[in-house]
A protein has these predicted regions:
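Amphipathic alpha-helical interaction segments
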Residues: 28, 70, 94, 98, ...
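Basic, helix-initiating cap at the start of DNA-binding domains
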Residues: 1-53, 59, 70
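Short amphipathic alpha-helical segment with a characteristic S/N-K-E followed by hydrophobic residues
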Residues: 29, 44, 67-72, 82-83, ...
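Amphipathic alpha-helical segments used for helix-helix packing
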Residues: 70, 75-76, 108-134
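Hydrophobic/aromatic-rich alpha-helical bundle segments in the mid-to-C-terminal region
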Residues: 2-3, 130, 134, 138-141, ...
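Solvent-exposed, amphipathic alpha-helical segments
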Residues: 28, 32-40, 95, 102, ...
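Hydrophobic alpha-helical connector segments
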Residues: 84-113, 166
């Protein structure tokens, strides 16, 4: 690998600098990290692998990201920079059903599930990855505030409903099967999880405390 892939700047590990060559470098590293996590998991991911598959020199990787933890954390940061918005079906149960089915879609296909599964595994082995995963989902839960706001306006949920607690409750039965009992998940289970969460919401189970 040539030194041409090094960048002259010296930002802190994982620092975001938009545009041009830096953006391309960051995307290339992200893609290599995702590929490595999918193929080898966090324990098998190496700086050498990322360098070989991204075309970015090891010196640059260490200087900008500080090591593997920084690269994995930044890949999660980039995942949170998307334009995803929660569904708007016209009802709380419909919105939660769609959210639950997104979880099913993310983890029921082997190819699609490899990266998110590896991110979760990495969070058990790296505090920095765990912090990044927490931040990713906290931001996702924040976007789901609109689901609850619409439900409150329609009279489907109490005004003090905690959106994050509600979304966790919808996802929890699905993720239990994916990561703990290793059972399959499907649309029927997603719909069941949504219906249960709606019933609990109406009973005030997710009131902010």
């Amino acid at each position: 690998m040539s030194e041409r892939d090094e960048e002259p700047a010296n930002p802190a590990p994982g620092t975001r600098r938009p545009g041009g060559r830096t953006a391309r470098t960051r995307a290339a590293v992200r893609d290599a990290v995702l590929s490595g996590l999918a193929d080898h998991g966090y324990p098998g991911l190496t700086v050498e692998y990322v360098a070989d598959h991204s075309g970015v020199h090891k010196t640059t990787l260490y200087r900008r990201w500080g090591g593997l933890e920084g690269m994995v954390a930044d890949a999660l940061d980039m995942a949170g920079e998307d334009t995803w918005t929660p569904p708007d079906t016209g009802s709380l149960e419909g919105d939660l059903r769609e959210l639950a089915r997104e979880v099913v879609d993310s983890f029921s296909d082997e190819a699609a599930s490899s990266a998110p599964t590896a991110f979760v595994a990495a969070a058990f082995q790296s505090q920095r990855a765990a912090d990044a995963l927490h931040a990713f989902y906290a931001e996702r839960f924040g976007r789901c505030e609109t689901v609850v706001a619409r439900a409150v306006a329609r009279g489907e949920a109490p005004p003090d409903t905690d959106a994050a607690a509600l979304v966790r409750a919808v996802s929890a039965p699905l993720l239990l099967r994916v990561f703990i009992t290793r059972e399959p998940v499907d649309a029927a289970l997603a719909d069941q999880s949504a219906a249960a969460a709606v019933a609990a919401t109406r009973g005030g189970a997710f009131a902010r405390r």
